[in-house]
Structure formats: structure tokens, C-alpha cells
Amino acid sequence: MEVDGETQIEELECDIRTLRKQLKAKVQQLKTLKKHFQKNCINKLNNNEIARYSRQIILSEIGVQGQLKLKRSSVLVVGAGGLGCPSALYLAGAGIGRIGILDYDEVELTNLHRQLLHTECSVGLTKVESVRSYLEELNSQIEIVTHHIQLTSDNALQTLESYDIVVDATDNVATRYLLNDACVLLKKPLVSGSALQLEGQLTVYNFNGGPCYRCLFPNPPPPETVTNCGDGGVLGAITGVIGALQALETIKIILGNSGVLSGRLLLFDGHQSTFRNLKLRPKKADCAVCSDNPSLTKLIDYEQFCSMKATDKDSHLNLLAPHERITVQEYKSLAESNVPHLLVDVRGANQFEICQLPASINVPIDDILKNRRTAEVTQLAATGGPVFVVCRRGNDSQLAVRHLSQLFQEQGLAPPRDIVGGLHAWTHNIDPEFPIY
């Protein structure tokens, strides 16, 4: 009897696998048929589309002709993260005929508080496939195209040229310049958004005679002054607000509506829940890329131009000489030998509360750079022995060491040293149970 039961289980599992394969094949056939049907029906709305989009079709700003414009349009969303997820979601819901999703990354647990098209089951999957799966379940009437690549000067023009509008939902400076220049060369509007901490910004570049990104920022900022979500943090609802507004601006461009944020910058303050609308400087007459006589007529090496990587991943600064730094292994050996020293943790107080190394004192980086507590640090250093500086990933600690070195030298103190890689390196190389965030 027991053998028969095991046999039945195996047979059922085999049947289920077969049915799943058949279902997958049928689903693919259905998608292919729908795409073929939709391509041949771009001049009218079917009954399903009329019912689905009825609440926006009845708006005088849209109507049937407006919905057909949306159906015939194509939008590329660059970045499937905090901004890209809500933007793609509302574009798909509105009935954009073809939506491209471009991202090189995979879903991580740290994404889920703000990138709400991904789920716990998506962790480890590519972001583009995770978004595609969600959007196809939301709206099977539209086409979702995935680009699992990192955008570069070599592939940008070819990738962007088949879309009407580009949505910049990225989080790094080099890619912003790349997207701007590519959109100018291809004569495509660029809907640009950003979000950090509890604030967000939104504008539209290269549209209706308005400025491009280079008109406003001809030169990139120094790498050490740039903060991304990984360093500065962000509240998920902020990215939701800005991402949804990016979708709105995109829809307005497609419909030909007035009021597009070209030449204007929308600022959102999540602290006070207020919006401000600022007028931007006009198009620059001598802009390197969008002027009548541009000096840039092809894409360049943007990582070299910006002196930073074209990636949303946390960057690693290299500001100090080797003798000004110490590895986590070296620091562990020193601490276990009970050598007198002072360990200064320059993270913010809220981050220090999450986790800290034994005997460390918290002096936030802002208090050091603005000389609010440097006297305190030098006094402790005079009696506590050599100073080692740590932060989350080893960037702010370098800034702190660079700032403190001159003060220490003036007072005859041993120079401070940075712990390479910060607390992330401690978790990876010393204590895997130490919290990482």
C-alpha cells in the first residue's frame, strides 16, 4: 500500500510538471497572438480596452484619440528601482503600447521597502524580469520589452532610438549625462526624476525648446560630494511620489498636453508635504551638446568625464595613501592585543544606534567637516592613543581622516587612519553576524 502511495505521488508530480509545461506554452502562444493582434489594431480600441481605460477615456484631456496616442507610443524606463517601479506601473496602467525596462541589477532585500514591483520571491531575480512579470499580469494588452544590460556609450543610441520618450529613473551622475546626451542626439524628451532622504525633484529635459541637463550642469560635481540612496537613505513613499509624477509627465508629453515640466523644476519636500515649482535657466546658447554648434556630437566616456562609475551600486572612494589606512584584519589584531587607541565612528547617530564596534565613540562626519567636534576628537587623541576612523563602507571615514590630518599634525599627534571598507568589510571578513545594511 505504501509503494502504491509513493507511485501515485510520483505520477501526480509528473502530471503537474507536464501540465505546467503545457500551460507555459499556451501562455506564450496567447502572448504572441495578442501582440500580433495589437500591432494590427493600432487605429482603434477593442471592447476590452474601452472598458479597461474607460475612467481616463472619459476625461476631456484624453478621450478616444488620446488613448490611441498612448496605445501607439513607446517609453523606455531606465532603472527598475525606487523611481522606475512606480513610473512603469502607472505607464502600464495607462495603456502605453510598448514599455521598455532597462536595468543591469538583481533584486536584493534592501530594495523591497521602496521598489514595490519586486517581492520577497523576486530576490535574486533580475529586476527587469521581476518588473516584466508584474506588469504583464497587470496589463496583458501591452508589450513589455526587457533590457538586462548596463547602459554604456556603446549601446545607448541603439537602445534608445526605438522609443519615443525616455524616463531617467537612475541614481548616478554618469548615467544622467549619458542619457541626456543620447536623448539630445536622438531628439527625444527625457523625463528626469531624483529622490533622496525625504526630498524629490522632477523636470523634463530636451523638450519644446527647454534646456537639457548639460545646460544646467555643464560640469559634473566632485565624486566625494555625491550622495546616493545607499549612502543618504530614502523613504519609499518619496520615490513613489516622484516616480508617479514621472509617469504623469510622460503621459502629458504623449498627449500633447500643456503644462509639461520643461524649463521648470518641481521640488517635493516630504517633511512638510509641500511642492515648489522653480523656473530654470533657459537653454544655454553655447551648450556643449544641444546648442546650434555643439562641441559634442557623439557619446563619450562618461565614467572618465564624471570620475565615477556609471552604476547605482555604492561607490568606493580612494582619497588616502596606503599608509593612512588599515585593514579590518589589522584593526582586529590591534584591538585583541589591547593596544590603547581611539575608534571614532563617523556615521550619523541613527546609524550608530543600529550597530557599532566595541568601545567606539560616535562623532558624525558633519560634526567633523564643520569643526563642531574636532577639538573633542583631538583632546581624546592626546590621551587615548592612535585614532582609527570607521564608517559604514569606508568613504566618509576617508573624508574625516583627510580633514583631521592637518589638525593632528599641528598639535603633534599621530596621524589618524581610516579602516578600509568600513563596517561592511568587518561583516564580510571578520564577523558575518555583525549587522549589514
Curated annotation (Swiss-Prot):
- The annotated active site, in chain numbering, is 229, 391
Pathway assigned in UniProt: tRNA modification; 5-methoxycarbonylmethyl-2-thiouridine-tRNA biosynthesis; Cofactor biosynthesis; molybdopterin biosynthesis
Names of the cofactor(s): Zn(2+)
- InterPro entries on file: MOCS3/Uba4 (IPR028885), Rhodanese-like_dom (IPR001763), Rhodanese-like_dom_sf (IPR036873), ThiF/MoeB/HesA (IPR045886), ThiF_NAD_FAD-bd (IPR000594), Ubiquitin-activating_enz (IPR035985)
Primary localisation category: cytoplasm
Q: Which Pfam families match?
A: Rhodanese, ThiF
EC no. given is: 2.7.7.80, 2.8.1.11
* One annotated GO biological process: tRNA wobble position uridine thiolation
Q: Which PROSITE patterns match?
A: RHODANESE_3 (PS50206)
- Subcellular localization(s) per the UniProt record: Cytoplasm, Cytosol
Q: Where does Zn(2+) bind?
A: 212, 215, 287, 290
Domain named Rhodanese: residues: 337-435
Q: Which SUPFAM superfamilies match?
A: Activating enzymes of the ubiquitin-like proteins
- Reactions catalysed: [molybdopterin-synthase sulfur-carrier protein]-C-terminal Gly-Gly + ATP + H(+) = [molybdopterin-synthase sulfur-carrier protein]-C-terminal Gly-Gly-AMP + diphosphate; [molybdopterin-synthase sulfur-carrier protein]-C-terminal Gly-Gly-AMP + S-sulfanyl-L-cysteinyl-[cysteine desulfurase] + AH2 = [molybdopterin-synthase sulfur-carrier protein]-C-terminal-Gly-aminoethanethioate + L-cysteinyl-[cysteine desulfurase] + A + AMP + 2 H(+)
Metal-binding among the record's keywords? yes
Enzyme class, UniProt record, top EC level: transferase
What keywords sit in the KW lines? ATP-binding, Cytoplasm, Metal-binding, Molybdenum cofactor biosynthesis, Multifunctional enzyme, Nucleotide-binding, Nucleotidyltransferase, Transferase, tRNA processing, Zinc
The text of the family note is: In the N-terminal section; belongs to the HesA/MoeB/ThiF family. UBA4 subfamily.
| Biological function | Plays a central role in 2-thiolation of mcm(5)S(2)U at tRNA wobble positions of cytosolic tRNA(Lys), tRNA(Glu) and tRNA(Gln). Also essential during biosynthesis of the molybdenum cofactor. Acts by mediating the C-terminal thiocarboxylation of sulfur carriers URM1 and MOCS2A. Its N-terminus first activates URM1 and MOCS2A as acyl-adenylates (-COAMP), then the persulfide sulfur on the catalytic cysteine is transferred to URM1 and MOCS2A to form thiocarboxylation (-COSH) of their C-terminus.
Name by which UniProt lists this protein: Adenylyltransferase and sulfurtransferase MOCS3
